[in-house]
């Protein structure tokens, strides 16, 4: 009798919980047919000269039915260029739909925080092709909600009366390069296009809020909406929220969520270990109300709109760096127009 047969027949009562009434087999597979679609990356027109400390805009063309990821590249007209500090090119990017501000993300958030907290795979992590501030990169990806996956794509075909626009605030070295913007579009078959164009959409989206550092030992958190997590852009080892020799705590409505704890490891290593997916070298303050920072599916929030007060308290060192909050909101698209369901 072969060893394989011996293992196969060595079954007891406990095995009923594992292999009794099997529901799957590892030796067959099934698949689902998907709706027909295509996709295309198309260059966008940047309106306004790219100059240091100035602003330009991109109004997305209605080339396709859905708008997906958007990114910027650099070149000197003879070859493409890579750079480590994209925050010297781009200060922040704002998203407008129908002339109303929907989200704003600065380069500190994109390059230092989102690179870790948004990563759903290695390719989008600090070990991927855009590693954030840790290494050089040939492109700068925007991290607005519609850029994070096909299920989040923005249905342009349902926005007959509202344009989608980004406004780019350039940083101090933008004039040194030729900057180009590209967007990925999805194209749908007639039936699915008609369905998306005519029905009402309540899109679950993420937004980014920012509080400037207080430069004192108490940081008031003036945020709104259900917040997934808090994070700071400080990636040094001697900041108030990152130092292994300073203690911090969170206070909500006058009640301490915890006693004072060392910033490192409690709010750096531990939070990244349990609540992120692809962080190998955590280096910034992170406080999670969610189970997973990278999941669009809600896994826990704290509704800051319902709080009287929220503070981060430092034991000895002043908090000098910005604090960011990533929150959920609903973008309603109906009758060819879009608007946020909940305002600040």
What are these regions (language model features)?
Residues 1-344:
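Short, low-complexity Pro/Thr/Gly
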